[in-house]
Regions:
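Active-site acidic/histidine clusters and adjacent loop/turn architecture
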Residues: 63-115
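Catalytic cores and adjacent binding grooves of peptidoglycan-active enzymes
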Residues: 44-49, 130-201
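Cell wall/extracellular polymer interaction/catalysis modules
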Residues: 42, 46, 52-60, 64-67, ...
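Acidic helix-start/capping segments at beta-turn-to-alpha-helix junctions
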Residues: 110-126
């Protein structure tokens, strides 16, 4: 990589918190650097869309083994409880799961639709009272779980990829067309699925 490209990339990394369009020069450069073989430092880039707020974020949250605190804070805010505005610090390893899922399905850095991030205890209880499939001790409340889908990727394929990572819990919500991933113990479940779907993966 030339010195001029290195300088430009460095300037992009000085502001990892900005919301970028996927086509912006910085976003393209950071995505390229994260997938170019031979880089000394691997950049971990996430492009997320919040299905409740309509917000998008494109951010490098980790360089090599080092998480970027300011970027994590921006992601935590992005995943806030949209009903109350409350923010919780997330386990950064859940962001690694999202990043690695895009690689596993063959689309590194692809956009991920966020169905649910953080829930306050009161929000979780409210959802449990009127919605089936909401756990009493949900890891969403602990900042360890995210519900998601990926545009253009079959959700069953996404489920298989998440199970293969074996990083924590994986739930498959067939009728709502999303999966749940968390950093708890390794386990799986399939909500309102046929026996064949439950056994798949």
């Amino acid at each position: 990589m030339s010195a001029s490209i290195n300088i430009a990339r460095f300037l992009c990394l000085l502001t990892p918190m900005v919301f970028l369009s996927q086509s912006s020069p910085c976003a393209q450069m950071l995505a390229l650097s994260s997938s170019t073989p031979g880089n000394e430092i691997h950049s971990h880039l996430l492009l997320l869309y919040n299905t409740h707020t309509g917000e998008r974020i494109n951010v490098v949250y980790r360089q090599g083994e080092q998480y970027i605190p300011s970027a994590l804070a921006k992601l935590d805010y992005f995943l806030r409880d949209h009903r109350t505005g409350a923010v919780r610090h997330f386990d950064p390893h859940v962001y690694d799961i999202l990043s690695d899922l895009t690689v596993s399905v063959g689309h590194p850095g692809a956009e991920i639709d966020i169905v649910c991030g953080y829930r306050t205890p009161s929000t979780n209880e409210s959802l449990r009272a009127r919605t089936a499939g909401v756990a009493k001790n949900s890891l969403h409340v602990q900042g360890q779980a995210i519900d998601l889908r990926m545009p253009g990727i079959n959700t069953l394929t996404l489920r298989r990829a998440a199970l293969a990572l074996a990083r924590g819990g994986v739930g498959y919500y067939h009728h709502s067309d999303f999966i749940h991933v968390d950093t708890g113990r390794v386990r799986q479940w399939c909500f309102n699925c046929s026996a064949s779907l439950a056994a798949d993966g």
